[in-house]
Amino acid sequence: MHITLIGVHQRNTPVTVRERLAFSLRELPDALLALRRYVEEGIILSTCNRVEVCAVTHDSVGGDAALKSFLAEQRGVDQAVFVPSLYIYHNEAVVRHLYRLAAGLDSMVLGEDQIVGQIKEALAIAHASGAIGPVLHRVLHGALAAGKRARTHTGIASGHVSVVSVAIDALRQHADLLKQGRALVIGAGHMAELTLKHLIAEGCSAITVINRTETRASALAQRYGVAWRPWGDLSDALAMSDMVVSCTSAPGIVVSWQMVERAAVGRSVPLLLFDLAVPRDIDQRVVEIPGVHLYDVDALEPICVTNRAMRAAEAQRAEAIIDGEVAKFMEWWVAQQAVPTIRALRERAEAIRDAEIRRALARCPELSPQQRETVVALSTAIINKLLHEPIVALRDPEAGSELVSAVRRLFNIDDATVHPSAKVT
């Protein structure tokens, strides 16, 4: 049994590739059902910064190939497009990655907590789809607990720690516009709400919310005391705005080149566009329009570098906490790896003992019932004595999965024996 994770991240994969691999929330249930044809357990995490597929498989090599094939087939993207920048983790490396991720240590914005909600959402969908089993349940709930502990006991999450807050940092370079200009927020999800909070905190008062589902737009606007407009007014709302933050979950372009070209006509101040969505909401060609400044999530990276430098000391403290939590999980994991091997080892020994005793007793019909019981008891005692030391060693958390694998090879215990319900893929 192996835990395997493959993924692409903002650090080494451009948004042009990430948006082709991204899954919307609506797509996840069907995608997870497809994933279960390849693996025992699975979960998909798709955010503006990363796309990751994590699964429990029966071997590392087969798991790697299965997850690559799944991602390519589901997204209709040739493996040659994403494999060069793909990262692959196994077992303890997967656990460490997910624990660090939940603590905000692997985020574009160091310490950000939006990832916690994204992990919980992905976990809930995977549970509802029947894709989560005991291993990933333990890993992911352990990750959430470890992340919470790291944030509680360090300053990793102090200050501005979200992609939205980084966008606001960029807006501060246009201080007059931020306080006196007109802002448009496209979307009505968590990121849109976070944008509203930051804009209001910065003193921006002329804010409009627009969303494809108008009831969500009106509810969000009412909650924060700002204006809202129906989706059909998007082009007009854009033309009346100086700052636009777009963060929908749409599968394609929401703000077209034509809309922005119209909005830029006769403008005395620059039009600032922040595209925080993946796939991207705004046609990237708008950068060619005079007076238009476009920032996508990758363009905000320089600000994030400064953020990470300021939190370096707290990050080290958080890493130490994560190390301890990963060690606890690995103790459980080694034990879980050993249990089916110990069971199979006992069954193999018992089968051999039983067969040999039957043959021996068949050759000695003169033995009395009491003598037969003595022979059976002797054989059982010998088996127990012989297996005692190997079983104690297998149960030792310090032994590691290497010993489990070695015992399975020595006693010819295969996957079908240890995992009788194993899928054939």
From Swiss-Prot:
Annotated residues for binding of NADP(+): G187, A188, G189, H190, M191, A192
Keywords for this protein: Chlorophyll biosynthesis, NADP, Oxidoreductase, Porphyrin biosynthesis
Top-level taxon of the source organism: Bacteria
Active-site residues, record numbering mapped to chain: C48 (nucleophile)
EC number: 1.2.1.70
Comment, domains: Possesses an unusual extended V-shaped dimeric structure with each monomer consisting of three distinct domains arranged along a curved 'spinal' alpha-helix. The N-terminal catalytic domain specifically recognizes the glutamate moiety of the substrate. The second domain is the NADPH-binding domain, and the third C-terminal domain is responsible for dimerization.
Family: Belongs to the glutamyl-tRNA reductase family.
Function comment: Catalyzes the NADPH-dependent reduction of glutamyl-tRNA(Glu) to glutamate 1-semialdehyde (GSA).
Miscellaneous: During catalysis, the active site Cys acts as a nucleophile attacking the alpha-carbonyl group of tRNA-bound glutamate with the formation of a thioester intermediate between enzyme and glutamate, and the concomitant release of tRNA(Glu). The thioester intermediate is finally reduced by direct hydride transfer from NADPH, to form the product GSA.
The protein's name: Glutamyl-tRNA reductase
Organism: Roseiflexus castenholzii (strain DSM 13941 / HLO8)
Gene name, Swiss-Prot/TrEMBL: hemA
